[in-house]
Amino acid sequence: YPADHYDGVFIPNWAMWFVLELGEYAERTSDRELVARARERVYALLSYFRRFENEFGLLEKLESWVFLEWSKSNDLVQDVSFPSNMLYAKMKLVMSELYGDAALAEEAQRMQAVIRDLSYTADGFFCDNAYRRDGRLVLSGEYTESCQYYAFHTGTATPALYPELWQRLVHDFGRDRRETKKWENVHYANAFIGNYLRM
């Protein structure tokens, strides 16, 4: 999604954007017919992802090309990608609204709570990923600007929940951070898709 692939490589987490876009389309147009026609396909997508859910309800070891954005983020996608899981939780929330599925809303809220608990660190940022080590998830200790944007864009984080991080992103991050050299422990975002999420 959205294009044909001839070598069998695909981007599993990118299909989640289709569900978010369907939700935005329904909100703008009130086209319930299209939403109803998409139901089978949307739930098939959810069924595909179910097999990757771990004991925390988070996606782990997604197959093929896990794409987040053209930056360091793409090196930090295994074993548990927190931005992908933020997007997955948002996908479930949108599905719950589109199809009146209260169970999915509860799942999404649990996922967001788990992500906040596991990924947000004492450094004041969301860590991008965790590796499975001896049966436990261990944070990589890597932070990217785009991961922070995914957190707020998907509602996993809000300005009310993380006011310091929000202020930091608003005032210290953005186009001139390479010049100001603020927060050099956080890898820079790129135009696609991190800077779009910032907007």
Language-model features and meaning:
Residues 1-199:
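Active-site core of glycosidic bond-cleaving carbohydrate-active enzymes
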